[in-house]
């Protein structure tokens, strides 16, 4: 990831198992996927509010299999009959980028190096990655190059 003024402005993520390369960011306002030999531009977020997304019945939410704690379960339980998409690592961001989920709640520890590149790709598509304070989503974006590289909890949408 390329970070400027504490914000991820460009990222590149390759997933060898899936042979997918994602790249893009806010500098260009777009993101791309190379899947094997095929290259396609990823679609921009519809920029729906988190409140509106949570209210939609059957909204796809991507969550970790191994880090699904009580806070994550409580968030999911507050949604309207969501469809859970399980995925590991920072690939959860990329599930949003591909349009296969609309919310990624993260209520477990991550480090900046775990999230920055995929976060940049998402932000290039107009998605939000807001921190959670006191168990509640804020309108504050996740920052990088902090003194403590541990990320706060966040929700991407």
Regions found by a protein language model. Give the residues of each.
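Oxyanion/phosphate-interacting regions
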Residues: 73-78, 92-157
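Acidic beta-strand-loop-alpha-helix segment within the catalytic core
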Residues: 1-94, 142-157
């Amino acid at each position: 990831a390329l970070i400027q003024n504490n914000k991820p402005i460009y990222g590149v993520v390759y997933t060898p198992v899936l042979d997918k390369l994602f790249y893009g960011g806010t500098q260009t306002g777009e993101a791309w996927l190379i899947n094997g030999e095929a290259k396609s531009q990823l679609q921009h977020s519809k920029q729906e509010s988190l409140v509106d997304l949570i209210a939609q019945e059957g909204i796809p939410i991507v969550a970790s299999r191994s880090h699904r704690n009580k806070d994550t379960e409580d968030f999911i339980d507050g949604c309207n009959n969501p469809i859970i998409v399980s995925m590991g690592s920072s690939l959860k961001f990329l599930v949003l980028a591909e349009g296969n989920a609309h919310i990624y709640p993260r209520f477990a520890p991550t480090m900046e190096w775990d999230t920055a590149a995929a976060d940049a790709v998402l932000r290039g598509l107009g998605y939000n990655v807001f921190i959670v304070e006191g168990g509640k989503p804020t309108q504050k974006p996740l920052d990088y190059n902090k003194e403590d590289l541990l990320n706060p909890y966040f929700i991407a949408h």
